[in-house]
Each structure stands twice: as C-alpha cells, then as structure tokens.
UniProtKB/Swiss-Prot annotation:
InterPro entries, per the entry: NA-bd_OB-fold, Rib_uL2_dom2, Ribosomal_uL2, Ribosomal_uL2_bac/org-type, Ribosomal_uL2_C, Ribosomal_uL2_CS, Ribosomal_uL2_dom3, Ribosomal_uL2_RNA-bd_dom
Protein's job: One of the primary rRNA binding proteins. Required for association of the 30S and 50S subunits to form the 70S ribosome, for tRNA binding and peptide bond formation. It has been suggested to have peptidyltransferase activity; this is somewhat controversial. Makes several contacts with the 16S rRNA in the 70S ribosome.
SUPFAM superfamilies (alphabetical): Nucleic acid-binding proteins, Translation proteins SH3-like domain
UniProt organism field: Anaplasma marginale (strain Florida)
Keywords of this entry: Ribonucleoprotein, Ribosomal protein, RNA-binding, rRNA-binding
GO cellular component, one term: large ribosomal subunit
SMART domains: Ribosomal_L2 (SM01383), Ribosomal_L2_C (SM01382)
Protein encoded by which gene: rplB
Pfam families: Ribosomal_L2, Ribosomal_L2_C
Gene3D superfamilies linked: 2.30.30.30, Nucleic acid-binding proteins (2.40.50.140), Ribosomal protein L2, domain 3 (4.10.950.10)
GO BP annotations, alphabetical order: cytoplasmic translation
Region described as Disordered: 225-277
Name of the protein described by the UniProt record: Large ribosomal subunit protein uL2
Amino acid sequence: MSLKVLNPVTPSLRGTVMVNRVALWRGKPEKSLVVGRVSSGGRNAHGVITVRHRGGGHKRLHRVVDLKRNKDGVQAVVQRLEYDPNRTAFLALVRYEDGELSYILAPDGLKVSDVVVSGVGSDVLPGNCLQLGSIPAGTFVHNVELRPCGGGIIARAAGSYAQVMGRDGAYVLLRLGSGEVRKILALCRATVGVVSNLNNQNIKLGKAGRNRWLGFRPTVRGVAMNPVDHPHGGGEGKTSGGRNSVTPWGVPTKGKKTRKRGKHSDKYIKVSSVRKR
C-alpha cells in the first residue's frame, strides 16, 4: 500500500501522512468471525493501572484470526483484504474448498483470488504455511510458532519478518528482526512472506486526537511532575532531572537490559539481539 499525503487545508492535516487503504474492503467484517471486545483501559482484574497511557479510543470488534493454519491440504481462495483496528497488519478473508471462511494475516503482495494452502508439500509462496524444516534457507517468513501446534507468535506486526538461516539437527536457525539468531524446532510452522502494510512505520498521525482514537492517552514527562510523583520531579524552574533516566518506580530505563539472566531459553539463542541505532 502506498502513502497518502493529505492537502494541508487545516493545521492538523499539514503534517499528516497516512497509508492509502483504497484497495481494502470498505464494508463490515465477516459476522461469523467477530466477537465483542471490551477495552480494559490499561487496568487489570482489580482495577489497578498496569499499563499507563491507555484508555478511550473507538469501539472495536475482535476479529478471530487463524494463527495456527492447521487445515492441511485444503486450498483457500482470498476473497478480500481487510483493515483490522486491533493490529497494524492487514487481514485476508479466505474461503476453503469446503466453504469454511477464515481470517489470516495477509502477507505483502497477496491479492484477491490468490490461492493459499497449508501443510507438507505446499509450495514456498507468500501466504502458504509450512513447517520450518520444509522451508529453504534465506526465505522470509512470518507468524512463526515457538512450539508445534501452538499458533504463530513471532513476526506478526506490519512489515515484520524473520529469515530462515539453516538447519541444526532437529532445529532450524531463525534470524529475528532484532538481529537475534534463535533455534526453533523444525516441526514448528511459519507462513512464507513478509507481513503486509510495510509503510506503517512511515505514517504521521498529524494531531493528538488521532492518537486518542487509537486508545492512547497523553504521556507526561517525569521532569514536569512533582517529587512525590516521579524521581525526576521537582526543582526550581526547568531541570534535567539530575540523574539517569528511570521509570516512576526508580527502575533504570532507556537502554537498560531487562531480560532475566540464566533463563532456560538461553540455550536456544545462538546470537544475541543487536540494538538498532
């Protein structure tokens, strides 16, 4: 999808850059594949804020997306491509030969009337789902499972992908978007291709209101608070905070490594992630 620069007839439109979604379905989603969704507003079951800066936003219906892709050997035809307000990637509505409808993550380049299929023996084409052991080295994949039959977890956001590096016994080496090279069981499934909506990283919302529509509330800087509210707060006039950046609870941030040392999954990591500058 291309980018759309709006005519600056108002101040809020002056810097707005959006993704042109003219090729997407404009109607309602498939009724049998949506369920109600209640926004938590960043609260847990006790009503305590666990994620700050969340709340409000437009009402949304949850689309039931097939992340397991375990209907093997049955071809499915792409009926349409749709926008999903709950994720950055686009969805593809597919109809299987037996008449069943399903939503899948749309890879880049997938078009209406294209045919996708899952299972052993499938061609290595965008949208097809295979076991990692059946995918040749150098192929870009997305929606990768960490456990067989567990459903895709890795590389599901817009424009994301992982690259198959090679075989290592019962495992496959996979290079993730962070630069980390990880061993994953060859029986785990992945979908061929790069996730759709590559230009999502280039959009500019243009105004605070559009961020509120998405369910994000304002973020207040710590140095603008009082000492009771944040370690960076207080001081006469404007200050720099007087210390390295920390969270409201005093935990170092902005580059501090948060991964627990000695995790059992460390043995599956061949090359640690590289921080992007």
